[in-house]
């Protein structure tokens, strides 16, 4: 995967996961660099990473349905979701609200790993039996339960 340059206005980048050119926004810059790291350094198969993946509709208390997209989902070799990743631009802090957002996605997917990343910091959580444990480092591909 080619190394990305810093985002500039009116720039596009080829996303190998979506197989198309996309606008190189600050969030996209963070996304592409982190996903490249997953593949190159942590040995995650690129073919098992879905980007901007539509989630099943969420039924809200008002009765309306709300459609969401996960920034990235890592799947097992048997196509079970293992990890949800939420990206923010490097100027956006990771907050409890960001964690709550990804936790809502996880009510639908029930994955064992949640990751938040903004280019400067990464929050990695292991979810097991409704308990969240924060991890110091990203698990290698061969450490995931798959």
Regions found by a protein language model. Name each.
Residues 1-113, 120-146:
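A short, conserved, highly charged catalytic patch centered on acidic carboxylates
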């Amino acid at each position: 995967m080619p190394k990305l340059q810093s985002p500039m206005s009116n720039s596009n980048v080829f996303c190998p996961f979506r197989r198309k050119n996309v606008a190189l926004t600050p969030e996209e810059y963070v996304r592409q660099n982190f996903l490249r790291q997953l593949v190159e350094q942590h040995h995650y198969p690129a073919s098992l990473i879905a980007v901007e993946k539509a989630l099943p509709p969420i039924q809200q208390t008002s009765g309306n349905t709300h459609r969401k997209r996960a920034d990235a989902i890592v799947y097992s070799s048997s196509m079970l979701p293992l990890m949800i990743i939420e990206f923010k631009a490097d100027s956006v802090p990771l907050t409890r609200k960001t964690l709550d957002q990804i936790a809502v996605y996880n009510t639908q997917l029930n994955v064992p790993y949640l990751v938040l990343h903004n280019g400067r910091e990464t929050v990695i959580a292991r979810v097991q039996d409704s308990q969240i444990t924060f991890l110091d480092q990203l698990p290698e591909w061969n450490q995931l339960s798959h």
